[in-house]
């Protein structure tokens, strides 16, 4: 079974691809039955289905017609495999229905299918820019240029608006062409949603928005002052952006600028929830520093007050942290309920408060990026890449989605880990065990990209001892309803089947997907760490690994030398070793904002990208061999090679000592050293390929052995050669570089694992 082929076809990877038949046996497999599903996975061979899906008439079922349904061609009926209800086909199916002429949704190759629904969205996508003006002139100039470029990438009918903030928050009127006009909110005041709606002149009544007739794109006349179609206001908005000035409020030498990020976001959320509830929209925040005033304040304006660190948070000695987090969480709930995504683009050397604001992006699946400045390529390319288009010219994003999961009676849903909120849908599919966001079978996802991946966890509920019919299968259906950027609603349906087997059957172990399992367990570990960042999470990971090895490894009791894992389990302990040392669980050397950013990206990434984050890839380039992957180990550092490290967040080219000396002596400029020039260029070309479709854009680092930036590589390597193991000071055996660390190496980690798994004494 090729797991990647299944992923290409259905966008799904399971931890186990044969399932234990009873609840007891399922708990003994340690890693829960779980799936990483990419709802908008790009597939070129999906047929355009321009009609409504056929749904089961069962009162609590509503499953959608799929290839696993039994079809009675003569009686024009189909049997739902989820609830066994007999359903008639709609009349328009009757004419052509035959065993040799089935509709696409019944063909085995279309276990994933996408319906284009007949009802279009009443309102086009909305993009509301929230722009920080408390930045230097050069920063503001670069930011304005990027924002003007972005307007040309939006759909012409998309609604667009602008809020700027510094000491005050200003909502700009786009319909007033004579001169710039804005509504001003005091940055130090905590406004209630009704106050904001009244001050903006929006109708606060809860009347549903009337359908839009062609030629009348403005559903709410009051809001049309602030949100207009790009094609109608591009000139006016470009003028406003180009004339934007730095916040005029004077800043004393020993103070930070007064920055009211909280008020600006509160106004943005209130504007959209009042005028466009339950509609596809994005609030895009461009933050050049931390909030220092008003609600959501992260740090005081006095420079002598440092911004909080992980150590401060652990000691519970942070003045603003809890209040700010609570404020942004309340905003995130209001935005996510209405389907509004919030993106945060940070352009600042210091922290901007991503830790406090993380709920805004985590609850709405917004974009989060970190860059040192708005002038950097990392910011510009990351932002403009989010507005990338497909071959038809539509934005590669879905809006205001709901994600439903159905299961057959043997399975129940434990929960989802990803950037979702619960839709509070109680159904017979909901299980007792809760992993992540549970107690529901549907979730709201405000924004989706073709790479957005959700982790869904299940439990087997069949009691032990209940007989199974031979080759009995369980079914799961993933249903994603979303607003396409073309203005249509679409429904993506994936139905998958897996076989049940008695506990202990060899096919269960053979079906283990160690890559998917590592990522699914990493998401649980990060979810636990978000609640309680303590060593308990590492202990839990270790316990799970030991139990998995005890269950599935071959060994003689109390004999560590006999320990052996089959190939489809053999790399799993290595993944866990690197996960324990990763920036997701080790906060040392990272700011709280960086930790929030790294965890945010992991919780939206597919298997391959997540694995690069957990266990980075390392390529070696030398004179005597073709470029080839090498161990992520200190023994891979040699003076005569170049290494290319990809950690997903960083792409690093590392020159060994000899290579660096030759490069500094400009040997590559001499004709006799053409092969050296080629060697220097090879990793640069490969790095460019990695940068091409990566989002967010990684930081690109070129360094030399012994240089300060070599720390990015050394921190990721397995320290098999340390200052304790080398015979000479600073050099390890076999030519590897000694790493100055007290961390245990993978070899020591594996020795301990073997001892604990086989039950031997560890003394």
UniProtKB/Swiss-Prot annotation:
GO molecular function annotations of the record: GTPase activator activity; zinc ion binding
- Entries under InterPro entries matching the protein: ADF-H/Gelsolin-like_dom_sf, Gelsolin-like_dom, Gelsolin-like_dom_sf, Sec23, Sec23/24_helical_dom, Sec23/24_helical_dom_sf, Sec23/24_trunk_dom, Sec23_24_beta_S
Any single GO CC term annotated in Swiss-Prot or TrEMBL for this entry? endoplasmic reticulum exit site
Q: Which UniProt keywords apply?
A: Cytoplasm, Cytoplasmic vesicle, Endoplasmic reticulum, ER-Golgi transport, Golgi apparatus, Membrane, Metal-binding, Protein transport, Transport, Zinc
Q: What is the protein's known function?
A: Component of the coat protein complex II (COPII) which promotes the formation of transport vesicles from the endoplasmic reticulum (ER). The coat has two main functions, the physical deformation of the endoplasmic reticulum membrane into vesicles and the selection of cargo molecules.
Q: How does the annotation summarize its subunit structure?
A: The COPII coat is composed of at least 5 proteins: the SEC23/24 complex, the SEC13/31 complex, and the protein SAR1.
Full protein name: Protein transport protein SEC23
Q: Which organism is it from?
A: Cryptococcus neoformans var. neoformans serotype D (strain JEC21 / ATCC MYA-565) (Filobasidiella neoformans)
Q: Identify the coding gene.
A: SEC23
